Amino acid sequence: MRRLRASSDGERGGIAVIVAFLMVMMLGFAALAIDAAKLYSERAQLQNGSDAAALMMAQKCAKNDTDTNCSTTSPLAADLANKNAIDGLSNVKSIALDKTNRTVTVTAGAKETGASANSVSLFFAGILGIPSAEVNASSSVRWGSPVEGTTIFPLAFSICQVSGMVDGAAQLLQNHSADANADCPLGPAGKTVPGGFAWTVQNSGQCGGLVNLAINQSGSDTGNDGPSNCDAVLNKWASELGAGRPVIVLLPVYDDATGTGSGASYHLTSFVAFSVQGWAFSGSDKLPMVYNASATSGLECKGNCRGIIGKFVKYVSLADGYKLGPVSPNGATVVEMTS
């Protein structure tokens, strides 16, 4: 009997169709992998650029809101966006600046020769009819002076020593109970304010404490041995200063004081930036409670002196954890990313 063989010619066309279909799928996956990687890289560069531009603008506005770079035509914004792109090309798509509410949002878009605005060309996806894709990144920043936050050190300065002294000369500031620093009539309704500084209440187990300018701050009594829980902070300050790096801290300012020690109450008005140079918070001559207390002529703090040496400065901080309000004339401002 003769065997009948089925012809395989009919299957050949089917296999070709399957291969063609698989090739299209492979091209699609290649488009997703390679082009997606390009889009991811481009967006990361744009995000860095928009972050840098927004932070720069907020810092400029915090220092001086009439600065040319505190405007929607900021020339430095475009420069920073370009410098954060690998090819040196980007486009500042928009700048939304609100000086009243102290916010700025910078949106950066891609820029590529031959591609449409804010877009990059795609290689594999182009084969599938998608020649380019738009890539943008936005960054929002706000600025202002602190009105609430946790301080790094439990100390508040008198308005007497701050007024007119931001970016001024270094001072030796002592506890107001020592009457070493001049009082002044800068309190509410011209009330006399004790000069120097005051010790404030610390958070449990911490060196600093929560400060809210809307609420009077209670005082504390550290005795002759300085504040507790502050060894690590003071040792770090000494290490930074010894290495030639500045130590600038944000601390509150009071314009009224009643009582003394742990029974005192202080009316706080603002935060100020203080550049620390030395201190003597106990009668010893060793760290952490004493550092560089006799290095500057005329500002020595020896014997019974309990004080801190340094100067008030205009300073923009990137520290987080503060609630912000309008910019204070006392020079301390904070800039923070919001998105």
Question: Where in this protein do the model-derived segments appear?
Answer:
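Alpha-helical assembly-interface signal, strongest on the long, hydrophobic N-terminal helix that forms
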Residues: M1-A77, V166-D167
